[in-house]
């Protein structure tokens, strides 16, 4: 059985809106929207991975990473995605994504979200 690959997804909320990013076309789930983040390196914590990925991909600085909100097995892959509440400063710039947007909670499901992100958005809406 393939080794599980841990992924952190940053749930960044500002003034009632959440940051979502559109995945590059050449990647898995290309063109779909996601909560930003990425794979953990060997021995890396969720906090360190979130800080590194958000700086690399969006040019924003993480202040705090909260405890995990939800962990999901990504359908059809060996990725396990852990969604964490993150506070970050700076205005995001899509460096690796096609686009980055602030979206109100009630509008999240209007976007074509990647499967695990869609499942998380449903959870978020029901809380």
Regions found by a protein language model. Name each.
Residues 1-19, 39, 70:
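Conserved N-terminal beta-strand and adjoining loop/helix that marks the start
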Residues 14-56:
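Conserved Nudix-box catalytic region and its N-terminal flanking loop in Nudix hydrolases
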Residues 116-127:
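Charged phosphate-binding loop/patch that engages nucleotide di/tri-phosphates or the phosphate backbone
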Residues 51, 55, 60-65, 127:
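HhH-family (HhH-GPD) DNA N-glycosylase catalytic core used in base-excision repair
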Residues 61-62, 70-94, 101, 105:
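Active-site-adjacent beta-strand/loop module that shapes the phosphate/pyrophosphate-binding cleft
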Residues 12-13, 20, 86, 102:
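Conserved hydrophobic "DFG−1" position in protein kinase catalytic cores
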């Amino acid at each position: 059985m393939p080794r599980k690959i841990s992924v952190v997804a940053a749930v960044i909320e500002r003034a009632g809106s959440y940051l979502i990013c559109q995945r590059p076309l050449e990647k898995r789930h290309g063109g779909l929207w996601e909560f930003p983040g990425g794979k953990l390196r060997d021995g890396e914590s969720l906090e360190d991975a979130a800080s590194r990925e958000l700086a690399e991909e969006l040019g924003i600085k993480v202040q705090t990473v909260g405890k995990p909100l939800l962990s999901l097995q990504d359908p059809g892959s060996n990725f396990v995605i852990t969604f964490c509440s993150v506070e970050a400063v700076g205005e995001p710039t899509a460096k690796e994504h096609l686009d980055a947007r602030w979206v109100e909670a009630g509008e999240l499901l209007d976007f074509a979200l990647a499967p695990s992100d869609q499942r998380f958005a449903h959870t978020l809406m029901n809380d």
